[in-house]
Amino acid sequence: MAGICCGVVGETEPAAPVDSTSRASLRRRLDLLPSIKIVADSAVAPPLENCRKRQKRETVVLSTLPGNLDLDSNVRSENKKARSAVTNSNSVTEAESFFSDVPKIGTTSVCGRRRDMEDAVSIHPSFLQRNSENHHFYGVFDGHGCSHVAEKCRERLHDIVKKEVEVMASDEWTETMVKSFQKMDKEVSQRECNLVVNGATRSMKNSCRCELQSPQCDAVGSTAVVSVVTPEKIIVSNCGDSRAVLCRNGVAIPLSVDHKPDRPDELIRIQQAGGRVIYWDGARVLGVLAMSRAIGDNYLKPYVIPDPEVTVTDRTDEDECLILASDGLWDVVPNETACGVARMCLRGAGAGDDSDAAHNACSDAALLLTKLALARQSSDNVSVVVVDLRKRRNNQASS
Amino acid sequence: MESSKQKRCRSSVVETIEAPLPLVWSILRSFDKPQAYQRFVKSCTMRSGGGGGKGGEGKGSVRDVTLVSGFPADFSTERLEELDDESHVMVVSIIGGNHRLVNYKSKTKVVASPEDMAKKTVVVESYVVDVPEGTSEEDTIFFVDNIIRYNLTSLAKLTKKMMK
């Protein structure tokens, strides 16, 4: 980490140009800071101060995914398979082989200043083969009320999506993802807080307190920002206020739009459903929930719905990386800044010649972004996934 | 003096519950266990037991309530002003917290429903509270009524489950 920081500080890179057409740009609350300043903030890691009286100070608990070790070995294994396939197959063209590798990724999830960890991250490279193409699944889920809805999304959503995509006609991604999210929502609703049903084994590692106090079950929900990456496309499905941002040639392109209750079209939808948005520590549905869409939260239906907004983006040679993160990051770090940080880390690893270096660069980017969020007094859990979208050369050295 | 400048508002929420009065009252009156039926309460610890009575039951008892994440507040400090097991009346004041509810005082009264004295209970929760700065009286009442209604709906579900 120190090495990366030292290397980056030496660079004199101009700030990433602002995309004036980006809605996120118009909404950003912080000025774009010089990249060196950003790194300095993170490198120094100033002591976390409890500026906000409403938040209790908690020790920052940094935790990578419990399955991270498996994830590493899976990625390595998939790389070997991919290279083997390329080597043995005469039908694969050079262009296609560029995209056949599993993308390198980095991810971090930290509790931050919140009392509990309610975020969850789901990484499933090569979770689906379709039309001879490898599909990869990445998801970030920011729970509220309790953690079990986000945990359930982490466990199940990729499998639900896989089953829906397998029966998908042509490329109807929007319909398929909406159906998947609705099934996920139904699934979390039907299971009474993971209580044992018909002798079925409890899937949760640790029982959450909702089992003991069922009235709270209805008030639990989660955001879900999900990306399915194929050799040619990036499909993003978003429900809630987590976010996906594409870094393309230094420019931050939002692939999702936050579902805030005071977003004009969401406000109209809620009112037409008979609901109401009240400003109580921010805009909230019925004065209670600060987002207009979520998985779960049965008590707020039909005002809070689980339907995602879906974007399908063609991949290009200029794509650098994709960042999926919870609002613990985006509330304090603008899209452009996050893009700049990730770009610096990836550049430090070169053009992806070395697969291990690229993987480390993504991990460094995710970690650096997380530290930046904490340094900027984020008051929430922070979860970040960085996906390397750059093309990889055929002559990639064996690791 | 300062509070006299603040605009106040008041409202009442009425809920009929399909359960006998003794059962409903036994849950409502447990000042130390609001999480049993209050939807947004995560946990509760007693700060002081007050004079007389058992823990959590004496007049003047104070509880520290931790609220669930996602809710527009993290904690609330509440005092039991009155608890009458004969007239089934409970009065609670909120004396602290980051929910913007200042000078909040609620009175909950439980009576057997005239419809079916043995099986139905009517819960009436009335309150007064300052209207927070920047918020309308209408929105304040809507917000608080909403929370109380959710709590009483949870209470109805809980008692229904307990009677099975």
From Swiss-Prot, chain A:
GO cellular component annotations of the record: cytosol; nucleus
Description of activity control: Repressed by PYR/PYL/RCAR ABA receptors in an ABA-dependent manner.
Enzyme Commission (EC) number: 3.1.3.16
SMART domains for the chain: PP2C_SIG (SM00331), PP2Cc (SM00332)
Site (described: Lock): 280
Cofactor note (record): Binds 2 magnesium or manganese ions per subunit.
Binding-site residues, Zn(2+): 146, 148, 208, 210
Gene3D superfamilies xref list: PPM-type phosphatase domain
UniProt note on tissues of expression: Mostly expressed in seeds and leaves, and, to a lower extent, in roots, stems, and flowers, particularly in siliques. Essentially found in the phloem.
The UniProt record lists the keyword Cytoplasm: no
Pfam hit, one: PP2C
InterPro entries documented for this protein: PP2C (IPR015655), PP2C_BS (IPR000222), PPM-type-like_dom_sf (IPR036457), PPM-type_phosphatase-like_dom (IPR001932)
Homology family: Belongs to the PP2C family.
Chain's role: Major negative regulator of abscisic acid (ABA) responses during seed germination and cold acclimation. Confers insensitivity to ABA. Modulates negatively the AKT2/3 activity, which mediates K(+) transport and membrane polarization during stress situations, probably by dephosphorylation. Prevents stomata closure by inactivating the S-type anion efflux channel SLAC1 and its activator SRK2E.
PANTHER family reported in the protein's UniProt record: PROTEIN PHOSPHATASE
Domain remark text: The 'lock' site stabilizes the complex made of PP2C, ABA and PYR/PYL/RCAR receptor by keeping receptor 'gate' and 'latch' loops in closed positions.
Protein name from the UniProt record: Protein phosphatase 2C 37
Swiss-Prot record, chain B:
Record GO biological process: abscisic acid-activated signaling pathway
Region span, START-like: 3-160
Superkingdom assignment: Eukaryota
Site keyed Involved in ABA binding: positions: 144
Short sequence motif Latch loop: positions: 99-101
Database matches in InterPro entries: Plant_def-hormone_signal (IPR050279), Polyketide_cyclase/dehydratase (IPR019587), START-like_dom_sf (IPR023393)
Site residues (Involved in interactions with PP2Cs), renumbered to this chain: 72, 136
Cited SUPFAM superfamilies: Bet v1-like
Entry's localization field: Cytoplasm; Nucleus; Cell membrane
Binding residues for abscisate: 73-78, 100-106, 125
Molecular-function GO terms, alphabetical: abscisic acid binding; protein homodimerization activity; protein phosphatase inhibitor activity; signaling receptor activity
Motif Gate loop, residue range(s) on this chain: 69-73
Record-stated family: Belongs to the PYR/PYL/RCAR abscisic acid intracellular receptor family.
PANTHER family: ABSCISIC ACID RECEPTOR PYL13, OS08G0374000 PROTEIN-RELATED
Described function: Receptor for abscisic acid (ABA) required for ABA-mediated responses such as stomatal closure and germination inhibition. Inhibits the activity of group-A protein phosphatases type 2C (PP2Cs), selectively PP2CA, in an ABA-independent manner.
Name of the featured protein: Abscisic acid receptor PYL13
Gene: PYL13
